[in-house]
A protein has these predicted regions:
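N-terminal beta-alpha lobe that positions the nucleotide/phosphoryl donor
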Residues: 1-187
Length: 187
C-alpha cells in the first residue's frame, strides 16, 4: 500500500515519540522519506524526542484550563492540536498510545483537517471504548472471550452474585477506560 503522506506529527512524548522517530529513521535509511514533527509541551523542550525529531512544535504549558475550569493535559486540548497540525503542515498524525490516542474527537479533527490519523477510526474507538459493548461485539462475532456476567453490576451485592455465578477468582473492571487502570482481582 502506497503511503500518501510524508510529514507526520507525533502527538505523544517520551518513549512513545522516540520509538516512532527511530522507526522513521529506519524507513528513511531504506530510501523512504518520513519527516517527523514532535509536538511537545514546555517541560519537554530539551527532551530527547524533541531534539531527535526533524522538526518540533511547542504546544505551550503541560496543562491547560478547560472550559469547565479544570486543568487538563495540553495533548488533550483540541484547539492547540489543530493549531499545531495547521502550522506544521502535518499530513498525518501519530498519537501512539494514551493521551489523545483514545480520543475519538481527535480522529474526527484529523479527518476534518484532511490529516491522516494513524490509528483506529473515531467510530471504532467509540465502539470499543465501552468494554461491555466491545465484549458483546466480540461474542457476536464468535471471538472467544473470558467468561463474564453479560451485564454490568449495578451494586456490590449484584457484583457478588455475578462473581459466584462465574466462579472465583474474578477480575473487576470499569466499563470504560484503558491501560488496566482500575483492574482489580477478587478471590
Amino acid at each position: 500500500m502506497k503511503r500518501s503522506f510524508s510529514r507526520v506529527a507525533i502527538v505523544n512524548r517520551g518513549e512513545a515519540a522516540l520509538r516512532f522517530i527511530h522507526a522513521a529513521l529506519e524507513l528513511n535509511r531504506e530510501g523512504e522519506r518520513l519527516h517527523t514533527i514532535a509536538l511537545y509541551t514546555e517541560p519537554d523542550r530539551h527532551a530527547a524526542f524533541v531534539r531527535q525529531a526533524d522538526e518540533a512544535f511547542e504546544l505551550g504549558p503541560a496543562t491547560v484550563e478547560g472550559p469547565d475550569g479544570r486543568r487538563k493535559i495540553a495533548y488533550l486540548d483540541l484547539a492547540r492540536l489543530e493549531r499545531a497540525l495547521r502550522q506544521t503542515r502535518a499530513e498525518a498524525a501519530w498519537p501512539g498510545w494514551g493521551f489523545v490516542a483514545e480520543q475519538p474527537a481527535f480522529a474526527d479533527l484529523c479527518e476534518r483537517l484532511g490529516v491522516t490519523f494513524i490509528g483506529p477510526s473515531a467510530a471504532a474507538m467509540s465502539a470499543l471504548g465501552d468494554k461491555i459493548a466491545a465484549k458483546r461485539l466480540a461474542e457476536g462475532l464468535g471471538i472467544p472471550i473470558v467468561p463474564w456476567a453479560g451485564a454490568p453490576a449495578a451494586n456490590e451485592s449484584e457484583a457478588e452474585r455475578q462473581a459466584l455465578q462465574i466462579d472465583f477468582p474474578v477480575v473487576i473492571k470499569a466499563s470504560s477506560g484503558t491501560g488496566g487502570r482500575g483492574l482489580r482481582e477478587a478471590e
